[in-house]
Amino acid sequence: MHYLPRREFIVQGGAALVALASFQSRIASAFPSRAGEEVIKWLDQLPPNPVPQVIKNQLVWEDLDSWVTPNDKFFSIAHFDRPVIDESTWKLEIGGSVKKPTTLTLADIKARPRQEVTFTVECSGNTGLPFFNGGIGNARWAGTPLAPILKEAGVLDTGIEVVFWGTDKGEIKRADDVKFTQNFARSMSLADAMDPKNILCYEMNGSPLPPDNGFPLRLIAPGWYGIANVKWIKRIDVNDQRFENRFMGRDYVTLREEDHNGETVWVETSVGRARLKSAPARVTHIGDDYRIVGAAWGAPVDRVEVKIDDGPWMPAAIDETDKADFAWKLWSVDWPKPSAGEHTVTSRAVDTGGQVQPAMDDPIIAKKHTYWESNGQVTRRINIH
């Protein structure tokens, strides 16, 4: 991520205004859809998904027509199996470095204070693989705050990390040829786990969690990539030492080259909080009146800019009909009477602190050697007839 220098912003902003005048463009709200409009399919459609058992229900960007993603259109990732859980026998265990180990039923959890959050969840590998650009969705999540449960269990002074164990499990093979079966798990620091925004979630868009999205209980940690929002939770442990497993120390680790005083240093970091990002979703038209619609998320978004081909950046209109601190913002820009032929559409988001979604040739993206945290500017191709 980089900052847009003031001079560059002024120059590009002025160019954008000139471009807007030449386009005779007008700003319009992103939703609802215009009556009679036709969606034009992107030329760069995804190839077949080679791992349908792992990635299910990717968002089809051209179909994006609402702020909240319906449950039946929400993506799901499973690293192991997709467990079938009987609510009547399911229990949540809380243990480790606590004074009072606790066991809760789903009824116990639902009887506790209720908290809701609208949060856009994105897989950290989204757009990092050629067959994967729909690992994202926005939902209204409801459950009970995590922090009071940990406080009631009595976290010991030695506790430093909280581990969330899922019911899903599979075989792990280490380089030394040791094989074993292990449940999925991720951890975060005790301080991060105690964030009052985190909830143990049992409801999605007003309905019980769907099986593929974590029934009966999952963690919802607003502002974090999807991997941290553990599904099918069965146990929560407070640890007195750092937790490492496949999904903390090997997978979901970003590798980058960084320049330090003229020397290249290879840096590995664990995937955690979401990064600023945007993407064009669809292009629609009524006759010669075209409109580009998209979304921006991952940080408090101040504005979104769009460019067509190698033209200047133009400001997009952000739809303020629905909004929440951790939900995506939908945006649009009108594109009157584009020339026939193939065009590219690129978007970039700018957050309230001035950080700009990086271009694909920005060193933070270009020198990244893993597909995690792929928040570079997204360019789509389209053909205008």
Predicted regions and their residues:
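Structured, non-membrane catalytic/scaffold regions adjacent to prosthetic-group chemistry
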Residues: 31-385
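N-terminal secretory signal peptides and thylakoid transit peptides that target proteins
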Residues: 1-17
